[in-house]
Amino acid sequence: MVLSGKPASILITGASSGIGEALACAYAAPDVRLFLSGRDPERLEQVASRCRESGSMVDAAVIDVTDREAMDRWISASDDVRPLDLVIANAGISGGSGSGTETTAIMRRIMDVNVGGVLNTIDLPLRRMAERGQGQIALVASLAGYRGLPSAPAYSASKAAVRALGGGLRPVYATRNVRVNVICPGFVVSRITDSNSFPMPMLMPADKAAKIIRSGLGRNQATIAFPWPMAFSSWLLGALPGWAAAPVLRRMPAKSPDCG
């Protein structure tokens, strides 16, 4: 359980790259047990090895977050090994280029992973943590969730759903001493951003993003949105009426697809 106020048993999805990888390495330490999942077996094992070098005991599993039964089995077994203090629902995929090019199949896949996968990750831990009267759940959304983006309509919709879900769950579970936090990053170096050909303002290294996230979770910050200039701009864009936001949205570059 929690040692000196720090999580000692942590489960992270999407840990084979990007923010998930950086968070796993940031939390890795002696007396910390990590349960990691990802899509890429080779990269996931590399991350697990780095975390073990930092002194952590690591259990790594290649699991599809959209497979509810498999997720329940994995999470239940992990919690049985060492009751989870912190669960980070990080796994997600990006969208296509928008402008009518996202097929229904692509949009459904994005929703299944980014929303369904989050639900499959947090459902069982929320119930168990509520029973124990302690724990923390972090949902990774995005600054893209502040407004529907024509360049990535399904992606922005999925992240808006995650953002709203976390915001709604937070006061409900606060009465049971379970903290719920929402993470809204801007551009963070990852395999997805590596494939983008357009300028990405304030692109941030994953380890720096992990440091910000870890600090925010430690302070139980409701929404951890960064970098702050982009967070403010995203909030403002979301608050604008449609006619005022339209010219800005039309100039936004398309996202590169990542629907594997």
Model-inferred region functions:
Residues 98-111:
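Substrate-binding pocket helix/loop in short-chain dehydrogenase/reductase
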Residues 32-47:
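Conserved glycine-rich Rossmann-like NAD(P)H-binding loop of the short-chain dehydrogenase/reductase
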Residues 122, 158:
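Active-site helix of classical SDR
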Residues 142:
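Residue(s) in the substrate-gating loop at a strand-loop-helix junction
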Residues 182, 198-234:
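C-terminal helical subdomain
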Residues 100, 149-153:
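Active-site loop immediately N-terminal to the catalytic Tyr-X3-Lys motif
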Residues 14-17:
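Conserved glycine-rich cofactor-binding loop
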